[in-house]
Amino acid sequence: MNTIVPDYSRRDFLKKSSFAAAGTLSLVSLPLMGASCTPVQDELNIIGPKTGYSPQIGTLVSMMNWMRNVIENQVSDLQQEQLDFLIDDKANTVGAMLMHLAATERFYQIHSFEGKNWGDWSLEDSKRWSVASGLGDKARKKIKGNDLQYYLDALGEVRSHTLNELKNRDDEWLLSVDNNWPWGPTNAYCKWFHVVEHESNHNGQIKFIMSRTPS
């Protein structure tokens, strides 16, 4: 699923995401329900504020870390042949999808942290990330022949920059609304939660491909 910036209407988006949003908002609101926003334990399976971040951003970071751990654990034993495996000539490889996750996050960085319009990428970023972002035939031809560490390094490089940038922002920024986003009025929290949800979508695809990969 390649839904970086969906072009469907806000009504359709809300209809499709209502159940997920209900569960997500219950998690997001946890830090605000009590009198304190004390950082929770620095444990992977504890969602909540984190030391070094504002309360809401820390909660987002804990969700980002949890989902990334799921992805990395799932692919931890894959060899190059498995990363390059195609179910059919229209499919995407696991390797390409890992690069796609890194590309998506990089483009959200540029938009969110640099204040650029979607698609207003530098030549350097376009050259490095556009093929992975688009997937499809170009990615099938270009993204192959790499070992797992190549993809983990790309994911780690991008994520490190995201976390450093988020440390310099506060909850007011996270809750600020972009009235010109294609989905309709959308805050930075929703955009970055989409990065998490996007990884979850592709995690299912990766799991399916791995179940069909010759042993």
What do these predicted regions represent?
Residues 1-8, 12:
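N-terminal secretory signal peptides
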Residues 10-33:
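N-terminal export leaders
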Residues 18-19, 41-51, 61-65, 69-72, ...:
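Short, contiguous alpha-helical
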Residues 19, 69, 73, 77, ...:
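A generic structural signal for well-ordered alpha-helical segments enriched in polar/charged residues
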Residues 32-41:
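Bacterial Sec-dependent signal peptides at the C-terminal "C-region" and cleavage site
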Residues 56-59:
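Short Lys/Arg-rich basic patches
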Residues 77-84, 164-176, 211-215:
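Surface-exposed helix-capping loop/turn segments at secondary-structure junctions
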Residues 131-175, 191:
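Acidic/histidine-rich alpha-helical segments that form the ligand environment
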